Regions:
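Extracellular-loop-to-transmembrane junctions of the mid-late helices
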Residues: 44-47, 167-201
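Internal transmembrane alpha-helix with an interfacial aromatic "cap," most often the third helix
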Residues: 57-63, 89-99, 108-148, 153-167
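N-terminal secretory/membrane targeting signals
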Residues: 1-23
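Alpha-helical transmembrane segments in multipass membrane proteins, preferentially the mid-helix core
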Residues: 54-60, 121, 157-158, 190-216, ...
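Hydrophobic transmembrane alpha-helical segments in integral membrane proteins
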Residues: 24-53
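Membrane-helix boundary/juxtamembrane motif in polytopic membrane proteins
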Residues: 176-187, 202-231
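A generic, lipid-embedded transmembrane alpha helix
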Residues: 76-95
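C-terminal transmembrane-bundle signature of multipass membrane proteins
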Residues: 196-204, 223-321
């Protein structure tokens, strides 16, 4: 067992002890009412998913120094995503345990922080060279990172306004005012904005040019990230509609919790896998290029420059496009 594994195991053990003791009550602390099986499962989903977030954050933090410095910001943002979510889920668990109410404020505090960071991962993984020259109204800050974060903020802010209306109606036992559907639709427009800027697996992106991403591992990661937000983010409106149609607090909360687990942990693992494979490709390309230079030097000690063929092979190993030489004939 290496040092990293030992530290991670120790940290998770120390965190699991208070979580286990906190999970023991079968009643709500505020009212003393006994939890139903569904309520118990809802509470345990907060505890278990929160622990999964914290464990993922530790794992990514330990992996951060093993990737190229150009790709570390993407992994660092991944640590922030699951780290913030783990902290907020602890607060949500405590809030739900008190009286079984919907922890909307804590949840949206999480989303206001983590969803724009998830959107920011797209330009970080693609790299600055992949940014397009498109801007919005030629205003400062309206480059690709700015646009994609504004779209995410717009989506979450609209969703919060709708959720507040919905929560008030659920608490009062009345039908929600129709205005909440307006906020819901506006939030979906923000979601579509993020999709347009970041791209989909089937269409190009407004703000990113994948042809300028030379590493195939990073292109694959971008495609998988797009698939995840295209499908995974749709779980959130499903949870919202469940609450609006009167299915119950727990059903809505469980849908949100499942969506967070799939989208946050799955998303950062895709980012980690892509940047680690890219680092392996860079290391292999470096070793191959060094070997080619050594071979060329051994073949012709009088000419230190390697042949064009060897340089072309080295460039191809890095994922770069090599132009065919023109025929002299």
């Amino acid at each position: 067992m290496n040092t990293r594994t030992m530290l991670l195991s120790l940290a998770l053990t120390l965190m699991a002890l208070p979580l286990a003791s906190a999970a023991s009550p079968g009643t709500f602390e505020g009212s003393g009412d006994t939890m139903s099986a569904l309520q118990r499962g809802t509470y345990m989903s907060f505890v278990g998913i929160g622990l999964a977030f914290v464990a993922t954050a530790f794992f990514l933090f330990m992996e951060r120094n093993d990737v190229h410095r150009d790709l570390r910001p993407a992994l660092g943002v991944g640590v922030m995503i699951v780290g913030i979510a783990g902290f907020q889920y602890n607060l949500m668990a405590e809030s739900y345990l008190f009286d079984g109410s919907i922890p909307t404020d804590f949840r949206y505090a999480d989303w206001f922080s983590t969803v724009p960071l998830m959107a920011l991962c797209f330009p970080l993984v693609a790299g600055r060279k992949a940014y397009t020259s498109k801007r919005l109204f030629d205003l400062p800050g309206m480059s690709v990172p700015g646009l994609i974060m504004i779209g995410a903020f717009f989506m979450i802010a609209s969703g919060y306004l709708g959720q507040v209306e919905l929560d008030a109606a659920i608490k009062a036992g009345t039908d929600p005012a129709s205005i909440h559907w307006y906020w819901f639709a506006q939030g979906m427009l923000g979601y579509l904005g993020v999709i347009v800027i970041a791209g989909t697996p089937f269409t190009g992106a407004y703000g990113l040019d994948d042809t300028k991403v030379t590493d195939p591992s990073l292109r694959t990661a971008l495609s998988r990230m797009r698939k995840l937000i295209l499908v995974g983010w749709l779980i959130y409106p499903v949870g919202y509609v469940l609450g609006a149609m009167g299915s119950g607090v727990e059903e809505m909360v469980l849908a949100y919790n499942l969506a967070d687990l799939v989208n946050k942990v799955g998303f950062v693992i895709i980012v980690w896998h892509g940047v680690r494979n890219a680092e392996s490709s860079r290391a292999l390309a470096h070793d191959m290029e060094a070997g080619f230079h050594t071979l060329a030097h051994a073949e012709d000690k009088q000419d230190d420059a390697p042949s064009d063929d060897l340089l072309a092979i080295a460039a191809m190993s890095r994922g770069e496009t090599v132009e065919e030489p023109e025929d002299d004939l």
